[in-house]
Structure formats: structure tokens, C-alpha cells
Amino acid sequence: MSNAPITHIDLTSFLADPYPALAHMRANAPITYVPELDATLFTRRDDIHRHEKRIEVFSSIQQDGLMTQLMGQNMMRKDGEEHMAERRALFPALSPRTVKDHWKPIFEATAIDLLQTLAPKGKCDLVRDFAMPVSAAALRAITGLESMSNLEMDTVSQAMIDGCSNFEGKKKVTKRSKKATRLICDHIKFARENSPQQSALKVMDDAGLSDESLNANIKLIISGGQNEPRDAIAGTIWALINHPSQLQLIRSGQATWLDAFNEYARWMAPIGMSPRVIVKEDTIDRITLHPEDRVFFMFGSAGRDETYFSAPDTFDISRITQPAISFGAGQHFCAGAAAARCR
């Protein structure tokens, strides 16, 4: 383990609301070893932004990690040229131009149809009736797995996210997550012969990715491409409803819906944490990290760094959010960021 200052946390409280503990770490020990997580946490924006790029020290390759065990080794668990080759293969499906010209009209049509269906009812469950299906429909289109239902897409995404964070080794969670990955593989086999031209499945297949890499990366896209937009859509709407002065800024033309999304993503980062493994001894601010040490880059904490954001716990869509690294930094910047902002 590193010789970083030690900070203890209550896991139950941390899982429910990590932000008070993260604020304490930023103020008192911005790089700190947390025994309950068996990891050294980086909590300040600049430290994360700087060192996340140093893949020669902070490696994403984790052969025994929960994500790799569950999905296979996807691009998120690769570095350097191996990562970039798969990222380039996926890029035609998720480039800003493709999102603007191809996906945006599809997303908008889906949202309008759903709103028109819900309007006569007078009320709805924001997550179940709107955020979940609108996000799932978009993801079915992007992946090319149109044979999946919206509910199936949501279920398998959540099951994989639960599996990737199943550090306690709960058998029911493991069983559910493995069932989800098998279902995804079945749908990939079904869709592969006639996958839509712009879909992730089609462009990666055309680029010659192996079956193993293609399957692993489709699972990766699903794991983050459903639950994160679903929660961001519902969360942004919830935040605006509960902060009427912020909603009024949009209605009066003083702010945009994108401003609201960017602020919500800063406030409740879609990527709360990204793990790394130390592969070469390194010293930072007199803290020595040793090979095999685990490091967690806490992107959720970076979005509330007081150095860049005044009153960081406050939802304020008028603030400048450019310094936020809500979608990561460097080589592992979220490949679906343009699609997420569009949704």
C-alpha cells in the first residue's frame, strides 16, 4: 500500500452520500489511503486531470478486476495503442458529427413521441415512464441491438453496473450480472447479420474487431450508456423542479438546457470513480505509490473542487462548468460524451 495519509470511512454512509467524506479528504488529505476500500484516492481536480493521463504509471489494465471478469477486456481496461485502436473503430458511431446528423433526430423523435403518449395521463413516474425508456431506446439504436426491449436494456445495464461494483461478492448480484451478459451476447449474435449502418455493432464489426473485443465493448457501451443517461435525464429534471429559480433562467432565455445538463454532470458526475493499478513506483507530493497498489480517481470529487467551483454543493446552472472533468480526462475520456450531451 502507499504511504498516503489514512482516512477511514463508513462504507454505508459513503455509498449513500460520498460528498461529505470527499470534501473532508480534499481539505485534509487530497491523496489518501482508505483502508475500507483498499485504495489510494485522488480527490482534487488538478491531481486527477494530471495523473489520469500517465498511463505508464496508472494503468487501466486489470485482468482480475470485476469489470474484466464480467464483460471481458474492453477498451476501458486497455491502455496505449491497444486502447486507441478500439476507440478508433468505435468513433464513426459516436463522433460529434454522427451524433448531430444521425442520432440527434432519432433521439428527438423518440422523446417527442413519448411525451405525447404521457401528456394525456397528466402525471408519470419520471424515471420509469420517461428517463428509462427514452435512454434505452437511444441506446438500442446506437448499439444496433434493436431486438432488445427498453426494459431489457435497462435491466442488463443495471445488472452489469451492480456486478462491476460487487466488491462484497454477493452471489445473487453475480448470478444476475452474468445472466445479463449472456443475454447481451445472444442479442449481438441475432443483430450482427443486419446491424444498422451507423451502429456501434456495425462499425466495430467492419473495423475487424475480434468477437471477444466486439462483445466486450458492446457490453461496456450498455453498462454506462443506459443507467448514466437515464439518471442524468431524471436527475436534471428533478434538480430544476426543486430549484425553480434555476428553471426560470431557462424559461427566460438566460440559460439553456445544455447549461443545466453540464451543471448537473458537474454536481452529480456520471463517472463517480475510475480505478487504476500502479505498474511502476512513483512519488507524488511525498506520497509513494508501489506496483499493484490500487488507485481510485474520484471524478465525482473533482466536480466539487473548491479551487474551481464556489459553493460546489449548490446546483447553479449559471456557473462556468468548463473546468469540470465529468466525462473523464485524457485517453480514457468518455467515448459517448457527445451522445450523452445530445440526449
Give short role names for the model-derived ranges.
Residues 1-343:
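Cytochrome P450
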